Amino acid sequence: MAKGNLNLQDLFLNQLRKEKVNVTIFLLSGFQLKGVIKGFDNFTLVVETENNKQQLIYKHAISSILPSKPINYMAQVQNSQVQNTASQQSNNNQNQESK
């Protein structure tokens, strides 16, 4: 994920993955899966279910994802902004020193 290209879906899924939050995934068919998100890309999710089996689920088949607890997915945005600001300040300091 590029630093300047953060989107809500990636922030949400990545925070669920990093915190290993249990989720219930509701599929369009009405089926429900419970487990932990292990990874994702633009089109799929890998979920480890309660019986320790991994399933690859296509995002277009998902209706919604319900986390078992609230998550702070905006923390990634704030961390990214702090890192970008620090990097810019460091670059500015280096540019001033070289003059």
UniProtKB/Swiss-Prot annotation:
Pfam families (UniProt xref): Hfq (PF17209)
Q: Which HAMAP family match?
A: Hfq
Q: Please list the GO terms describing molecular function.
A: RNA binding
Q: How does it assemble?
A: Homohexamer.
Tell me if Transport is a UniProt keyword of this record.
Answer: no
| PROSITE patterns from the UniProt entry | SM (PS52002)
User: Lineage, please?
Assistant: Bacteria, Bacillati, Bacillota, Bacillota incertae sedis, Caldicellulosiruptorales
GO CC aspect terms: cytosol
Tell me where in this chain the Sm domain is found: 10-71
Classify the source by domain of life: Bacteria
What is the gene name?
hfq
User: What is the official name of this protein in its record?
Assistant: RNA-binding protein Hfq
